[in-house]
Amino acid sequence: MISNTVRTRFAPSPTGYLHVGGARTALFNYLFSKKNEGKFILRIEDTDIERSTKESEDQLINTLKWLNLNWDEGPIIGGDYEPYRQSERLEIYQRRAKELIEKGKAYEAYISPEEIEEVKNQLISEGKPPHYTYDLISKYNTKERIEEYNYKGLKPVIFLKMPQKDYELDDKIKGKVIFKKGSIGDFIILRSNGIPTYNFAVVVDDIEMKITHVIRGDDHLPNTLRQMAIYEAFEVEPPIFAHVSMILGPDGKKLSKRHGATSVEEFMVQGYLPEAVDNYLALLGWSHPEGKEILPLSEIIDNFTLDRVNSSPAIFDEKKLKWMNGQYLRNKPLEEIYQLAEPFVTGSKLLSKEQYEVNKKWVIKALETILSSVEILSEIPEKMEVFLKDVYPDTNDPEFKEYFDKRGVKEAINLIYKYFNEDDRWDTQTITENLKNAMNEANPQKKPFYMSLRKILTDSFHGPDLINTIFLLGRNTVLERLQRVIEI
């Protein structure tokens, strides 16, 4: 155990749905903080005013709650370092930027975005790296320009002075990473509208919120050089960094829509279980010491360490996730599955809410019957439909006729109709007895008989347990469908 002061954070931008990569980042931060008896902080990085929305933030929060990744500090619940939305922390960034100016680590620049672009293009035309320096930028800080800005109420941008030296990162997943001297030049930390750049806001927040470990996707690795320079300017020890490799599709290419569902919200809509999604996401890069795959969150927490996180890209396979979800689903009590399935069954109009509740025992029996073939909740209505839809099998179908014409099949079907019609009892035991009696008396070939019977009752040669199917169809329906063919 590292220490009980571990503080991790998940800091998403509320600009859309929470994708698989972001969800895994949140999960790894949550797991690491819980394993080390620390704190998991949620911070909303909403300084991109044009793209950030309250709706996206609400959706993000609901998704994290659904995943059971409950934060110790953050929006809604607050904490010692609030506010936890960057849009509410602008004064903090502005104050901290002025601190760096006073220390000589940063400088104001009375320069427009167009002029910054001109400086860049000029450097490129001269065959030089497009790196800004104080000498190049400060020449715009003329007395006339400063007076003009003051008169118009405009604010300067603030640049950080980038030290020209090597930076070394000891990444807990990637290992040693060297950022060579001269990789970048000076860079903006505060825009003229008072809004910080991403790297500056992140560092200020991580300092203020006492973040000890930054666990994030390796697409952020290039940002680390700028962030290390900002930490150095503040004379603050950087947190421990751990950059998790990207997630690829089964074809080895970057995960995208063409690989199927990529956002947690899509999994929610399709009827995945949060515990299955957590389990699967944890295995995208991390592995259990004993190679176990089906793991409750508590066991993942107990065994989670960064040294078991692979530095190679993880492969996202939705088929594997579906399989895992099926394992979790089949381990649940039928009463709980009944509750979980309700919005999917009633939402499909297969049954009304009232029908679902009034016929609870029947629904639970139907769920029990189809469960072995169900992996996600949204598959349930289609699987359950066999017990509810009316069917008129084509008795001229060549495959059906081949089965139906085999020895003893017609006679056995006639006998079943007779026994079911004469016996008022309707339960699986009675159905089994009557089937056995018909089989013993007519002695049909087994496979043709069962294939014919299933086709007559469900218009399919394959399906769930036949005895349960007959019971769930109901006595009247079974008699009606048998009657259609007993004269053939």
Curated annotation (Swiss-Prot):
Q: Name one GO biological process term.
A: glutamyl-tRNA aminoacylation
Protein origin, superkingdom: Bacteria
Catalytic reaction(s) noted: tRNA(Glu) + L-glutamate + ATP = L-glutamyl-tRNA(Glu) + AMP + diphosphate
Q: Where does ATP bind?
A: K257
Sum up the protein's function in the record's words: Catalyzes the attachment of glutamate to tRNA(Glu) in a two-step reaction: glutamate is first activated by ATP to form Glu-AMP and then transferred to the acceptor end of tRNA(Glu).
Q: Which HAMAP family match?
A: Glu_tRNA_synth_type1
Q: How does it assemble?
A: Monomer.
| Family statement drawn from the similarity comment of this UniProt entry | Belongs to the class-I aminoacyl-tRNA synthetase family. Glutamate--tRNA ligase type 1 subfamily.
Official protein name in the record: Glutamate--tRNA ligase 2
Recorded source organism is Petrotoga mobilis (strain DSM 10674 / SJ95)
